[in-house]
Structure formats: C-alpha cells, structure tokens
Amino acid sequence: MSEDAAVEETPVWLEVNGAPLVTWMCTPDLLEELALGWLHGEGYIDSVDDVRLRPCSTDLGFWATIPEAKLEAIRAENRRPVLASGCGAVATYLADPAGAPITRRPPVVLPPVEQLRQLFKTLFQLGTRYRDTGGIHAAALTDGATLLAHAEDIGRHNAVDKVIGSLVLNRRTIAGLGLLVTGRISAELAFKAARAGITWVATPSVPSTLAVEIARRNGMVLIGRAVSGTPALHGAAPAGAG
C-alpha cells in the first residue's frame, strides 16, 4: 500500500494585533493569500493597505497588524464561536444571518450554462493535486469569461480564502465577480462571498439552506448542480428571471 496519495495537511496560525485569532488546518501553499483572504472575508480589512502581515521565520504562521478601530468594529458585532460544517479553520465566528440587513443589489447577470460548464472544466484541468491524490477542494474567481485566480486546498473554505486573497494582494477588484467551488456551499462560505461583494457562487454540489438565506438577504445567486444540464438557482433572482 502506497502513501503517495496522502493529502498534505498542516496547521498555520494567525495573530492579529498580538492576540491569537485562528489556526487553519490547510494545504501549505499560497499562505499569504490565505491570510489576506481570510482577513478580508471576515471583515478585518478592506484592502492590502489595511494590514501589515509578517510571516514567522521559525514556524508556519503570521503576525498581522490592523487599525484598532477595525478590530473594535468586529468585536462590536458580538460574533459567536461556531463549529462550522466545513473543514479548515479550527474555529470560526458567524453573525446571525436573520439579523443581517438586506443588501439591495442590481439583478445578477449569470454566464450561460455551457459557459459555466466550461469554466468548471478549466478549473478541474488546473487541479493537479486532485488528479494526483483526490480528496482536495478547488476554488476560482471568474468574470464569467475566464478564471482570474484559482487555488486548491484540503479545506474548501481555505481554497476560497486563497483566491480572494490573491486578488486582495494584487489590488484587484473582487466585487461583482463570480466564485466557483467544488464542494457544497455552506453558510460560512456564503458569508465570505457576500462580504467580498461576490454576486454569484456556483458548485457541482448544492448549497445549504442557511447559505441560501444569506444569499437571498445579500442579493447573491447560488448555483447548485452547476455542471449538470439543469443547474438549480437559489437566493436572489438573477437578471431576466420572473
């Protein structure tokens, strides 16, 4: 029996303003992107200019310094620690979606079904770790025509943080883009996408009911069974619906 097919997993920690905040169990690549994407998706930063990120030279981890006002605003949300359904971060904090304000956005324009399938085909072709081992998740940000960033990780939320962080690092606009994921769309993933201004999220799998509620309240469309002939739309109504 060979060990070649084992998926690499390692802990990576993050401290913010001197306090331990999160530890990821993750695939150890694109770690700066992972940290930036997580901070952006959780509302700690709006851009790379909001943070000073220093890697530890003796361990896999980062020290981040952000404006204290940002940290106080997060604390004021009274987020509760939650054991999330996804793999990746050891701890996560979610606000109550039922209490979140409804975000009014223009109707979302979705790519045609065949174009969506082609985008996923490209993502799967880029999945070298998946081909080598299986048991890995992938994510990509797209403008509907091409993939702008992609990543693989043992945790699907980590893969999303990595692609968001890639655009944050390169000072590229995330709002208005679409997100491809290979696993189910959980509440945590929907929160991350909504905070980033992503307008639609697609998966070959399905979204959770709480993810659908988050999408509905934030004007976001979730696309389940995206590589099938008849994708299922959830959340906000896309342009041309009705």
Question: Model-derived features: where do they sit?
Answer:
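Surface-exposed beta-strand edges and their flanking turn/coil or helix-capping segments
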Residues: 27, 35-40, 76-80, 154, ...
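Intrinsically disordered, low-complexity regions enriched in acidic/Ser/Thr/Pro/Gln residues
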Residues: 1-143, 149-150
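Generic structural hydrophobic/aromatic packing signal, biased to beta-strands
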Residues: 14, 64, 87, 139, ...
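Short C-terminal domain-edge/linker segments immediately following a structured domain
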Residues: 44-46, 54, 94-98, 170-171, ...
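Short, basic/aromatic-enriched C-terminal tail that caps enzymatic domains
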Residues: 230-242
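Feature captures the catalytic cores and cofactor-binding loops of soluble hydro-lyases/lyases
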Residues: 156-233
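Histidine/lysine/aspartate-rich catalytic loop segments that bind and position anionic ligands
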Residues: 126-172, 178-179
